[in-house]
Regions:
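N-terminal capping/small domains of soluble enzymes
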Residues: 1-117, 125, 423-453
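Alpha/beta catalytic cores of nucleotide-metabolism and tRNA/nucleoside-modifying enzymes
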Residues: 1-24, 108-111, 176-177, 183-187, ...
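Bateman/CBS regulatory modules and CBS-like beta-alpha motifs in cytosolic regions of diverse proteins
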Residues: 27-50, 57-59, 88-128, 133-136, ...
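Hydrophobic faces of well-ordered beta-strands that scaffold small-molecule active sites
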Residues: 54-57, 78-80, 232-238, 258, ...
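Glycine-rich phosphate-binding active-site loops on the catalytic face of alpha/beta enzymes
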Residues: 79-85, 262-265, 311-325, 369, ...
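Short beta->alpha transition motifs characteristic of CBS
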Residues: 80-85, 142-158, 194, 198, ...
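Active-site-adjacent beta->alpha loops and helix N-cap segments on the catalytic face
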Residues: 86-92, 212-223, 244, 264-281, ...
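Single conserved hydrophobic/aromatic residue that forms the stacking wall/gate
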Residues: 451, 455-462
Length: 462
């Protein structure tokens, strides 16, 4: 017979914050949102500390290279999705680690034979008005020219005109060489009154572009999450099947932390995965685990050696695990229970294992609630899927710009080894749906507004 939990199971929406006393010192600038990402012993410091308590979900529709760079710039961390081949995931991790701050790889690249109408469509799709022209249309092709909004007039010009007829050709461009520093690139931009500076290699292949508009942003990112080599930090998702093949590639690519991505974390399969990582890498490779919804699940994974533990089953906005399997728990109740277990575990063992609240965030204030309930940080899917930096298309739905968003348990994500219990057999069990989320512009604007709000709160919970 099943065990019945006494009391009710609550979601975040059933709680409110009672504002506490605000002194003259209680201002956002005096608040630090730094939080541990990985386990540590009493008296020691964690190996990895987040500068803001936010990480992006291990999802195809959320966490790609652009999200990895953008979120690390703001002090959080992105977990590259594992529902792809080990080689392609490792390549994404490497791209984030190799990213040179300020040098942007174009995702709006043209060929000379494209038409003005295609340029306009690409501008509408990406929002970018500066587009390099390369011989093969790739971001690393040979640079032939550049197109900006000043090179054509849609209201007067022939929309069938070829790019090669109105682009600014290579011989008229000022470019930077592959060894140029960001400071020097910005100097060239200002001295020559440029809006953008293409950077090329010895063979004139495009490496990236430095934009004038980014100059100030690089001076106003004190929260950047960097490793000891001043590279952006990034995480990566793994599963309980191919870890022996995947983990070495991710470690070689430079992943700072791994996380087992599963809808059910209280399992022998997660234990085996963590044990394999420890046997092959010791404590050098950090690995989080989950998801669980009670104290027993937390203690199991903590004893297995998980560096952090995710809480939440079925609470995601596009997750239907509760409807299809009948398992889960109200996110607020689960979080309170697990955080209490974390504190008890720390008192008993002297080891602090951070808790990540994963799912159940419907409104922004729910994040403040999650932190007030004890979460060390939050993993967010829908919230980050709305921004420019998520990997999905921006589309127009009934006159409103939206971004595509789908769950890792959906048919679209192909159930890529996540929603199972491990072992050799593969299941095809739909636990997520496809959807759209309202487009919200750049991540920087949204996150800055949010963590300023979180820092201003000094609540009690009712």
């Amino acid at each position: 017979m099943a065990t019945f939990f006494p009391g009710e199971s609550h979601t975040f929406s059933e709680y409110l914050l009672v504002p506490g006393y605000s002194s003259s010192e209680c201002i956002p600038n005096n608040v630090s949102l730094k939080t541990p990402l990985t386990r540590f012993k009493r008296g020691e410091k964690p190996a990895i500390t987040l500068n803001i308590p936010m990480v992006s979900a291990i999802m195809q529709s959320v966490s790609g290279v652009d999200m990895g760079v953008a979120l690390a710039t703001e002090g959080g961390m992105s977990f590259i999705y594992g529902s792809q081949t080990p080689e392609s995931e490792a390549a994404m991790v490497k791209a984030v680690k190799d990213h040179k701050a300020g040098f942007v790889e174009s995702d709006s690249t043209l060929t000379p034979k494209m038409t003005m109408s295609e340029v306009m469509a690409l501008k509408e799709k990406t929002g970018h008005s500066t587009m390099p022209v390369t011989d093969d249309g790739t971001p690393r092709g040979k640079l032939l020219g550049i197109v900006t909004s000043r090179d054509y007039r849609p209201s007067r010009d022939d929309h069938s005109a070829l790019v090669e007829t109105f682009m600014t050709p290579r011989e008229k461009l000022i470019v930077g060489d592959k060894n140029i520093t960001l400071k020097k690139a910005n100097d060239v931009i200002w001295e020559n009154k440029l809006n953008a500076l293409p950077v090329v290699d010895d063979y004139d292949h495009l490496i990236g572009i430095v934009f004038r508009k980014d100059y100030d942003s690089h001076k106003t990112n004190p929260n950047e999450l960097l490793d000891s080599n001043k590279r952006y930090m990034v995480g990566a998702g793994i599963n309980t099947r191919d870890y022996a093949e995947r983990v070495p590639l991710l470690v070689e690519a430079g992943a700072d932390v791994l996380c087992i991505d599963s809808s059910e974390g209280f399992s022998e399969w997660q234990k085996r995965t963590i044990e394999w990582v420890r046997a092959n890498y010791g404590e050098d490779v950090k690995v989080g685990a989950g998801n669980v919804v009670d104290a027993e699940g937390f203690r199991f994974l903590a004893d297995c050696g998980a560096d952090f533990i995710k809480v939440g089953i079925g609470g995601g906005s596009i997750c239907i695990t509760r409807e299809t399997k009948g398992i889960g728990r109200g996110q607020a109740t689960a979080l309170i229970d697990v955080c209490r277990a974390r504190d008890e575990y720390y008192e008993e063992t002297g080891v602090y294992v951070p808790v990540c609240s994963d799912g159940g965030i419907v409104y922004d204030y729910h994040m403040t609630l999650a932190l007030a309930m004890g979460a060390d940080f939050m993993m967010l899917g829908r919230y980050f899927a709305r921004f420019d930096e998520s990997p999905t298309e921006r589309v127009n739905v009934n006159g409103q710009y939206m971004k595509e968003y789908w769950g890792e348990g959906s048919a679209r994500a192909r159930n890529w080894q996540r929603y199972d219990l491990g072992g050799a057999a593969k299941l095809s069990f739909v636990e997520g749906v496809d959807s759209y989320v309202p487009y919200a512009g750049s991540l920087k604007d949204g996150v800055c507004l949010l963590y300023t709000s979180d820092a201003a709160d000094d609540p009690e919970i009712v």
